[in-house]
Amino acid sequence: MTILTFTLILFLGTFIAGLLGSLTGLGGGVVVIPLLTLLFHVDIRYAIGAALLASIATSSGAATAYVKEGITNIRLGMFLEIATTIGAVVGALIAIYMPTNTIAIIFGVVLIFSAVMTLRKKNEHALEGGSPLAEKLKLNSTYPVDGQKVPYKLTNIVGGFSLMGVAGVLSGLLGIGSGSLKVLAMDGLMKIPFKVSTTTSNFMIGVTAAASAVVYLQRGYMDPGIAFPVILGVLCGAITGSKLLKKMNPKTLRLIFAVAITLVALQMIYNGVQNKF
């Protein structure tokens, strides 16, 4: 395979990754890492390094549009980033010394969890009574629905903050942004409307990934030949996805995505058990 062919295939694959990451709030890494390791046989640590950069690109591309539309809760995102950033650095340091096959198995398990999370019932309603802590931290906000701003309130701030720390560790360890856990924390525990939790997750993923990427960069796990087409493809896909989100019902997409991700996850787990990484 020539360098040009490799670059074009990688660009197309990561374009799809960015598109799906933007539409589902999971980040492009859930597709980028299996693509690099299973198809191109790239060392999983280099794949994680590229995926972290891809997550930054996905977050940047999608988050810009969502912030302009007033959907993203920026104050909440920056508050929760305290937990995820600390967790991300810890996870990245663990990944440096953990066997690659073990990382692959954990990655597969988290992918299956992510697939299940995409199919769960989403919270589309704004909570009327929030917690005093959310009020004190000024985390309650509004989001646009049919041209009107709908207020919503948050609950279980401590539980959501704690789960964000776990999401940060997995992000640093696996390079996938841990969007599913972030959405679970905001949508499931804190009772934020799903569209707000998805867009805020996209906003946060880039900051979390940047913290992890520093560790991988210092250890030499960033290859420009891999990273450049990955960043370009994911960024283009993320921008496209942010425009499509307003015009489509993503339920069918989530179902197809969940099935595909589950198959990829099983392959990752199998290869990890067979010591093929």
What is each PLM-predicted segment?
Residues M1-A17, L38, I44, K68-G168, ...:
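Juxtamembrane transmembrane-helix boundary motif
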Residues G49, G77, T198-T199, A258:
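Conserved glycine-rich helix-kink/hinge and helix-boundary motifs of the Major Facilitator Superfamily
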Residues T24-I82:
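Juxtamembrane transmembrane-helix termini in multi-pass membrane transport proteins
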Residues A51-S55, S201-I205, I226-A227, I231:
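Short hydrophobic/aromatic, small-residue-rich stretches within specific transmembrane helices
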Residues S60-I71, L170-S171, K182-D187, T208-M222:
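Generic transmembrane alpha-helix signature in multi-pass membrane proteins
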Residues V32-Y46, G172, L181-V196:
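Interfacial segments of multi-pass membrane proteins
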Residues T14-G25, A62, M164-L174:
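Transmembrane alpha-helix interface/packing and boundary motifs in multi-pass membrane proteins
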